[in-house]
Amino acid sequence: MLEDISLTVNSDSGQPVPVRAWRLAGQGGGPRVHLQAGVHADEIAGMLVLHKLLPRLEQAHVDGRLRGTVTVVPQANPLGIAQFRNGHVLGRFHEATSRNFNRHFNESAALQRPATTFAAWQKALVDLAVDARIVLDLHTDSEALPYLYVNRCFWPDARDLAGALDASVAILWDNDDDGAFEGAMVSHWLREKQIEGRLAATVELRGQSDVSDALADRDAQSIYAFLCGRGVIAERGDPRAWSGEAVPMGHMETVFAPVSGVLVYERELGAQVAEGERIARIVARPGDPSSEHVLRAPQAGRLVTRCRDRLIAQGDVVVKLTGSKPSANWTGGVLDP
């Protein structure tokens, strides 16, 4: 049966708030799985995907086909959801500490008695997930193709996940000094020498506006098929061959806005661009033709993400694109602040 294992953490005002979570215990000794969405509380697509996936998992359990134990956390961040300001949810950063909700998980997990609501929430999520053999953390970018972040130690075994989700790109990383949730899983498993046969991945489900029944149904089916292929569900998964691109994180190019202004894209998502090709421009002072700043591809590659706002601040990420060689600008760590 579906077990409610919801957690309670304190909000920034000191009031208890729930982290809704459910667990289905399988009967066949299959892998333990943790699925969550909404660590960045303004990234909505994964919430709807898990909302649609949970009844399918429950039916598999009723039918006796669930072999593994699956934990589902469709909306993982009650702190971020509470940050509605002027009609928008400020879901990426914790207002009280200015910390990115998907950073510092390693630090928080190591604390015996977390002193802040932020750290206590992070530790609770890690404790809920760390015993799983498969951990999928669902996110979205601003505007994006579907893509994955995967530690290199899981590659190429994670090609089945990339194929199931029809991911355009798998970004392979080696070291996570910033403490993303996925990185906290990997760090713990490596420390305990439990990495064999496991998988943790950050799944980027396109852009923040890509929320619909059609997309959520497709993604829920993709994750279901992946779980079938991994032996979590006793059902044929119809694995898809993956035709995407695996790129080391250091080969990704991030183009930042050199000035503030009106952002105009000249190439679409998914476009293959040549080194030096125009990809966008920023009109710093509308009405002044001399204020246009042209942005060019630092190297040849494919446009994977772009900013959805068309009025951009200096220093914001404009686009990210794949590269075939190390980026001259990458110094380690994650691609976004």
Describe each region flagged by the PLM.
Residues 1-337:
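Structured catalytic-domain cores with a bias toward divalent-metal coordination
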